[in-house]
Structures are given as structure tokens and as C-alpha cells.
Amino acid sequence: MSKVGSSLYSRLHGIFKESSIATAKSAKPRSQTKSTKFPSKLKASTASVGDGGQSSNDAKDSKNSKLTQKVEKFKRSCESESFRQVHGLYSAFIRRLREAKKFSTIDEVLQYQKKFDDIKSEDFVIRIMLLYGYSGMAEHAHKLFDEMPELNCERTVKSFNALLSAYVNSKKLDEAMKTFKELPEKLGITPDLVTYNTMIKALCRKGSMDDILSIFEELEKNGFEPDLISFNTLLEEFYRRELFVEGDRIWDLMKSKNLSPNIRSYNSRVRGLTRNKKFTDALNLIDVMKTEGISPDVHTYNALITAYRVDNNLEEVMKCYNEMKEKGLTPDTVTYCMLIPLLCKKGDLDRAVEVSEEAIKHKLLSRPNMYKPVVERLMGAGKIDEATQLVKNGKLQSYFRYLPDLSAGKKKTTSSPVSSSAKTTSTPVSSSPDTSSFLLSLSLAADSSSSDSDSSSPDSSSSVSSSPDSSSSVSSSPDSYSSFSSSPDSSSSVSSSLFSSSRENSSSPDYSNSVSSSLDYSGSVSSSSDYSSSVFPSANSSSSSSGLLDD
């Protein structure tokens, strides 16, 4: 790779060169907190109550029938032009299908969109491509990209960038690089800064410093200047690898370019410090952030909560949680997925129930490890009514997404170990078969077990994070549950721009928000972002898709 006279390139080259040994040492996989898998007991439970295997088959047939009804209802809703403009409705529906691994159904729903004139709009096609990408179906996105001329839809650098993002979010990084190298010249497309930012993110995930340097060299050679997103992506990677010296040099380099750090920049640094248990430094940095006029957000507090949770420090976790609420911030799914199991682990069942009810009240998108420990401990303590009420409340909000094991007469064991100081004795559940069956029937039947999922998806082999942007996904962080955390800063702001429903009654389609500008993870709109911003509603989204997703 040839050297150029660019001061930016030279300085980056020096930073990367000095960190190459450290990078190699730190590239080993981070130890992850193993998340307990809770296999669905639906079949076993129904078999014990009903007619054996026949009951299980009937339940499966019933679930498939309900899914078919929902899909048909969604298709009918798509006939409305105003419905097609509300991005969040599509995103929420596809998210549910993806979590249930219904890949063929995802393809059916997205293919159905070709019947509308909107398909001639590049922005509308981009939305579909991104939904494919976040479902781990990048090959489908590429096929749609190839079909655009036949659909009388113009192909520009915007749809090309969406294709790259589809590969990146499907974790098919080699294919993304191949597409980046081959298609622009073949199709006469000139890459822009969004293109380069997307590839910087892909290469950071891959851990290829030499290739990142090549991208920066090409970027400058073509007359572009790295923006805040370019540097934030690098900062996230260096601090994730705990390369603080090199990360701080990137920080200084960014400021020398007259780019002021934003909330995402600070959050990357805070996460790096808390992962290394440098709590005092992290708190001091937050104070500096405040003096710069930048207020901590939910993700700042989540970084602190994550670190304190690893140390089983419930007192500090609750302090952060309460301070967050005092400042008018609404805890998100990540917050509750860390807090609720920790409360159960410490034996504080009453407060765990209280916090669970609060999460349900906020209509948060839940995860299997979020409420299950509470329900199991309530059942283990013989508090059948409270367990029933908790499940019912979640069911009414359509946000319970697990099938707890509430088999009759079975001794309950906790999903997470109880500390010796707060250990409680589990007692056999004396609920009758009818009670168990009733509680199971209250649970949302969107089971993602392999027996009910599509295994034929051509792209389903790739692991897809729950949240679209996984530049700092759980796979790289030992402090997060594998079922939820991804881009730490992408959840709170997306709905305000990409998925605003204020245009629902508009007389003409407007898809510009999905492509004309992308979100930096802090929520500030940047004209030169990448397409890594979430297509899905935020974790705090209260949209229930007008009942389309209700069971």
C-alpha cells in the first residue's frame, strides 16, 4: 500500500502501526457472560395436559394459522398509501418475524411490496433492502438491487450504500468488501462519504487495520474529509479493544480536524473505561462531558450499570437507575434486562416485580431473560396469583416474548444463581394442570424454537443481532446479554427521524427521511452518515403497530 503525504493518513498510519502488536494481543475473543437458554416447554406442557403429541401438533397448527392471519392482515394494511409511509410499522412487523426466524415469511411480505407504485421510488426500495439486511438476508437485498432497472427504479449511490449496509448488518463482511470493490466501476457509481463510512464500520468489525488505512487513503484521494461518524467508528473499535492510548490519539486527531466529540464519542470512551473497571476515570469523564454542554443519555448510564452489574453491585446499579429517572430519562430494554435479573439474583423479589411492572408500563420490547426470572421465582415462592398477573399484564401490552416453564408440580429452579446472602428456598409449584396451561396460554406464542422456524432461508446462517447496528454488539462485549444489546447509542433517537409517523395522513408519499440524511448514533442528523442507523424502532418505542402484532 503506497504512502501518501496526507497528514491524516500519516498520523493514522503511525497510530495503527504502534498499536498493531497490542491489537493482535487484544484480538482474542472477549469472555462473554453466558446467557441461559430457556428452551420452550410448550410441547411438553401441552402433552402432559392434553392428548400427548396431538396437542402439540394442534398448538403448532394454531400458531401457524395465527401467523398466516397476521401476515394477510399486514398485506391488506399495505394497500393504504399512508400506511406504507410509516416506517416503524414495517420495522416492528419484520422484527417480530425475524425473532421468530420466519425468514420465508419475511421474504413473502417484502416481495409483496413490489405490487405498489412506490417500488419505483429508490427510497422505498432502500427501506426494503435495509429490512432484508437486518434480517440477515443480504442476498435477497442484492437480488432486489439487481432488479431495480426492471422495476423502473433508478439506481444511485444511495441504493448502493444500502446494499453495502445490508451485507454489513448481515455480518457478511467479505461480501461487502467484494461488492465495494467491484460494483462501482461496473455500474458507473461514484462512492460518497456514506460509502466509505459504511466500509470503515465493516472493516472495524473485521479488525483489519491495514484495510481501514486503505479506505482512508482512498477517501482522501477522492477529495473527501472524514466526518464525526468516521472517527466515532474508529473510537468505538479502539476503546472496545481497550487500546486507550491509541484511542486517545484518535480523539486528539479528531479534535485537530475541528470536529467536536458528541455523545456517541463520549459514550465509547466511557464504555471502554467501565469495561476496564476504571470507574473514577469514567465518572470524571462524564463530568467533563457535562462541562462541554453534553448531557449523559440512557446509554451513558447503561455503560455504568453494565460494569456495576458485573461486580454484582446492586447499590450502585440502583443509584444509576434512580439518577437516570430523576433526570427525565426513560430506561430502555438494555437497562431492564440488566436490572431485573440482578434484583432476582440478590433476592429482592418485591422490587423485581415493581421494576418489571414499570418496564411493562413503558411498553418496552422485552427479551426472554427480562421477565422470566421474576415469574419463575414468584412461582417457586407459591405466588401463583402474582405470577399470573405479571404475565397477563405483559400479554395485554403484547410485549411478553417468552414461554416460561410453568409445568404443573415441577420444582422450580432459578435461571440465575442466587447469592448465598440472599438465597431463597425454591418450593414445588402446587399449581394445577389448568393453572399451568392457563399461564402458558397467556404467553406470547411467537416462539423462536427451531421446530417452528424457517431453516431454509439462504441467508439465515449468519447471526443477526437484535438491534440493527451491532458495531459494538454483544459478541464483542462481555457485559451484555446476547439477546439484546447492539449499537449502544442507536436506540433513543431513531424514531424521531427515520420512523416519524407524523406523515401517516400525508396526501403523498415521503420516504426522504430514510435516505436523505442518516442518524449519527447520538441522534443528531448528519448529512454524511452511513446507513447503519436502525431501521427498527427504538427499544423504547411504544408503537404496537395498530394492533397488527397483537396476539
Swiss-Prot record:
Gene Ontology molecular function, alphabetical: mRNA binding
Low complexity composition bias: residue spans: 415-435
One Pfam family, short name: PPR
UniProtKB keywords: Repeat
Gene3D superfamilies recorded: Tetratricopeptide repeat domain (1.25.40.10)
Coiled coil: none
Bias (Polar residues) ranges: 29-48
Start-end of each PPR repeat: 121-155, 156-191, 192-226, 227-261, 262-296, 297-331, 332-366
Record's keyword annotation contains Repeat: yes
Annotated stretches, region: Disordered: 22-67, 409-435, 449-551
InterPro entries documented for this protein: Pentatricopeptide_rpt, PPR-containing_protein, TPR-like_helical_dom_sf
Bias (Basic and acidic residues): 58-67
PANTHER family linked to this entry: MEMBRANE-ASSOCIATED SALT-INDUCIBLE PROTEIN-LIKE, PENTACOTRIPEPTIDE-REPEAT REGION OF PRORP DOMAIN-CONTAINING PROTEIN
Family listed: Belongs to the PPR family. P subfamily.
Protein name: Pentatricopeptide repeat-containing protein At3g13150
Taxonomic lineage from the root: Eukaryota, Viridiplantae, Streptophyta, Embryophyta, Tracheophyta
